[in-house]
Amino acid sequence: ATRIAQAIKEGEFNLYYQKINSIQPTATASSHYEILIRMNEEENNLMPPGSFLPLVDQYKMMPQLDRWIVNYIVQWLSAHPEVKATFCLNVARDTLNDRAFPSFIQECLQKANVPASSFCFEVEVLDARTNIADTLIFTQEVRELGCLVSLCSFDPDSSQLLDKIEFDYLKIDGSLVCNILRDEEDLEKIITINQLAHKTGIQTIAELVETDDILAKLQQVGVDYAQGFGIGKAQPFKDLEL
């Protein structure tokens, strides 16, 4: 726990970004980037999130780490005021339950004079299902600030969440996207999700888009955005050029 606390305090993390592309020809969308994180180890090695995030979660330190990430991005945006982009950050379960987190976001944005629409907070379906009350409060508060909210790993079984909570984006589960060319049932699910989202004014993002053929099929279906190795691999945030 001490090691994790020290890493957060000292900022011993490297942020990465992965491009999320608008895939509809008529779209005039701003640039979107998913923010990913690695932890510095000795000898300049980087630990992937699967190695350290479970520990951060176990020690209930995710809200502190999420604050560090928000603050880092806000400072970067403050130094690059010409940038018109949306950065997508995954919000941990404990952060959803943290009543002080939305006011922390507001304070950071106001101090640095950064537009709230620069942030899209991503909530996992499982976390939303098991914490509906907390998710509802969190999404209402950050959307009131002007931030965006995305519901991740979405499948048709999660559609009842849309009756209770307002979202700006739905991220279609990558396991469906991977099979879109092989499995008619998964294709039908994606079509259903896309129609359901658009009917309620929500835009869709397909994750794990690996090939041009999958991308072409998603365009045909009418999905709005795509993310994955077929669009672009994760790159160090410090190298981001817009």
Question: Model-predicted segments: where are they?
Answer:
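C-di-GMP signaling machinery
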Residues: 1-14, 56-60, 95, 101-102, ...
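A short beta-strand signature of PAS-family and PAS-like sensory folds
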Residues: 18-20, 89, 210
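Catalytic core of bacterial c-di-GMP phosphodiesterases, primarily the EAL and HD-GYP domains
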Residues: 25, 30-34, 59-134, 148, ...
